[in-house]
């Protein structure tokens, strides 16, 4: 009798798996909304932990379906709603896709104003992650340090808590649109490459060797000297420094090396 009950629970509970991409996640949202499956959760197939009481179903990424969902979010909910979802997604939280799916179902049913109901568990599950990612993005927009390499390519390495590469790519493709640059996340072996026309993200394990441009060597020397001279010993406040710039980020800063 117990085995039959367990079997029924397992067969009736479906979870969707996707390829880890934002488009893959939105495809799952589409399928969950229009199919009869009514999945209990959506998970990245590469990090999914098998559940005895759930039947996984892999959903192939469909760009047309994901585009429809993205468009529906913007048109029926709001751009703010969409940006919250994007930021939350790049937190890489294990349950983030499930949280997003449930919030979207709630939002499409009740309207765009639900994003303001931050005390609601379906809303806070996404908004809290989005805000954490957004704070770190804002920090790195002013914190990343590009080095000019011989050949004119600008290179930056950093180690964020969240997956900031796609978010910073969007910012710097406008800010530094006339330069060729690479932003390298050393924690994830991931980088965004920009060639003055478009950017793309790929796996990247770093440069085997590189030579700094002569002008860059001079700049780094001047910057370190400047930082040393303004840090008057009596006024050095490590606690305050850490509050503005967490120490875990220091090793990638020119002035801290």
Tell me what each language-model feature is.
Residues 113-203:
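Internal, well-folded beta-alpha domain core
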Residues 14-21, 57, 121, 153-164, ...:
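Conserved aromatic-histidine-acidic binding/catalytic patches
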Residues 43-138:
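Charged, alpha-helical interface segments at or near domain boundaries
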Residues 2-61:
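N-terminal ordered "arm"
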Residues 83-88, 187, 236-242:
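Short coil/turn segments at secondary-structure boundaries
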Residues 24-35, 101-109, 170-174, 220-228:
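Short, hydrophobic/amphipathic alpha-helical patches that form generic packing surfaces
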Residues 180, 191-192, 196, 211-257:
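Long, compositionally biased intrinsically disordered terminal regions
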Residues 60-65, 199-211:
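Acidic, Ser/Thr-rich peripheral helices and adjacent loops at domain boundaries
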């Amino acid at each position: 009798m117990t085995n039959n009950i367990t079997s029924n629970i397992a067969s009736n509970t479906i979870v969707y798996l996707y390829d880890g991409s934002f488009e893959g996640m939105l495809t799952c949202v589409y399928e969950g909304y229009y199919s009869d499956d009514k999945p209990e959760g959506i998970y990245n197939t590469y990090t999914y932990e098998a559940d005895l009481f759930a039947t996984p179903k892999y959903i192939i990424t469909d760009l047309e379906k994901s585009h429809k969902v993205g468009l529906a979010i913007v048109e029926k909910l709001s751009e703010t709603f969409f940006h919250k979802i994007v930021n939350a997604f790049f937190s890489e939280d294990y349950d983030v896709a499930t949280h997003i799916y449930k919030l979207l179902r709630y939002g499409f049913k009740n309207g765009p104003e639900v994003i303001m109901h931050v005390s609601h568990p379906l809303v806070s599950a996404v908004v809290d992650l989005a805000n954490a990612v957004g704070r770190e993005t804002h920090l790195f927009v002013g914190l990343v340090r590009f080095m000019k390499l011989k050949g004119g390519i600008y290179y930056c390495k950093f180690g964020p808590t969240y997956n900031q590469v796609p978010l910073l790519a969007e910012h710097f493709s406008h800010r530094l649109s006339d330069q060729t640059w690479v932003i390298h996340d050393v924690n994830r072996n991931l980088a965004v490459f920009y060639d003055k026309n478009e950017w793309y993200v790929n796996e990247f394990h770093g440069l085997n060797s590189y030579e700094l441009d002569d002008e860059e060597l001079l700049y780094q020397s001047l910057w370190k000297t400047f930082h040393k001279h303004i840090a008057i010993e009596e006024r050095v406040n490590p606690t305050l420094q850490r509050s503005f710039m967490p120490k875990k980020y220091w090793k990638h800063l020119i002035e801290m090396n």
